[in-house]
Amino acid sequence: MSNFAVSLPEVIAVLPAAGIGSRMLADCPKQYLTVGGKTIIEHAIFSLLHHPRIQRVIVVIHPQDTQFSRLSVAQDPRISTVYGGDQRANSVMAGLQLAGQAEWVLVHDAARPCLHLDDLSRLLSITECSQVGGILAAPVRDTMKRAEPGIQAIAHTVDRQDLWHALTPQLFPLELLKLCLSRALREGVAVTDEASALEYCGYHPILVTGRSDNIKVTRPEDLALAEFYLTQRQSLNNDSL
């Protein structure tokens, strides 16, 4: 392990992967679909394990999952698994219980196979300057429309000046994230990402600019796009050798 990794706070990663991904219309959960020669979840895990500051990855799986244990990455000693819950917040909380005494926890979507190492490094660097944490995010470039309630018609255009697409990973002090998620769950607040729980509790995580090709595979057409990005990256890596 490098001196760089030892001198900075310990970071544990949690990868919620207990969902079934019904919008993909596939025969298996989307994280087990193959893209670029590996399953989506393998790409997501390897992008974390390749960084020297990530000590361990906790993969949160569905109680009836029989596929993760068959992957070669499941045998890596830095990988732990735990069963998740019905909602993302419950699954993340289950993962946090295995994080031990780590100072910081990084949560990454199992369905994001295109994370760049330099984006991850920029996010991890905030442990040196923030006590709240932050997320990878991309500024909104498209024109945004708000729909009329209940119908698919434009109500008005939304000012995109300060709008960002929330991405993952998202990085927070372990105990702070536990506290905020616990409160949100206890009070019945719907949180769609970990930053939402901190926002609910009055905190303001940092926005760290990330690449917009860090896509989440949600629909069938996303597979081809992820394949393109991964192939392009591999081609660039080969050209640099």
UniProtKB/Swiss-Prot annotation:
Tell me the route in metabolism or biology where this protein functions: Isoprenoid biosynthesis; isopentenyl diphosphate biosynthesis via DXP pathway; isopentenyl diphosphate from 1-deoxy-D-xylulose 5-phosphate: step 2/6
Tell me the InterPro entries matching this sequence.
IspD, IspD/TarI, IspD/TarI_cytidylyltransf_bact, ISPD_synthase_CS, Nucleotide-diphossugar_trans
According to the UniProt entry, what is the EC number of this protein? 2.7.7.60
Q: Where is this site: Transition state stabilizer?
A: R23, K30
Name the Gene Ontology biological process terms: isopentenyl diphosphate biosynthetic process, methylerythritol 4-phosphate pathway
Keyword Nucleotidyltransferase appears in the UniProt entry: yes
Q: What does this protein do?
A: Catalyzes the formation of 4-diphosphocytidyl-2-C-methyl-D-erythritol from CTP and 2-C-methyl-D-erythritol 4-phosphate (MEP).
PROSITE patterns, alphabetized: ISPD
Q: Where is this site: Positions MEP for the nucleophilic attack?
A: R160, K216
Keyword hit for Zinc? no
Q: What class of enzyme is it?
A: transferase
Family statement drawn from the similarity comment of this UniProt entry = Belongs to the IspD/TarI cytidylyltransferase family. IspD subfamily.
One Pfam family in the UniProt entry = IspD
Sorted alphabetically, the keyword list is: Isoprene biosynthesis, Nucleotidyltransferase, Transferase
Per UniProt, subunit arrangement is: Homodimer.
Specify the protein name: 2-C-methyl-D-erythritol 4-phosphate cytidylyltransferase
> What reaction gets catalysed by this protein?
2-C-methyl-D-erythritol 4-phosphate + CTP + H(+) = 4-CDP-2-C-methyl-D-erythritol + diphosphate
Q: Name one GO molecular function term.
A: 2-C-methyl-D-erythritol 4-phosphate cytidylyltransferase activity
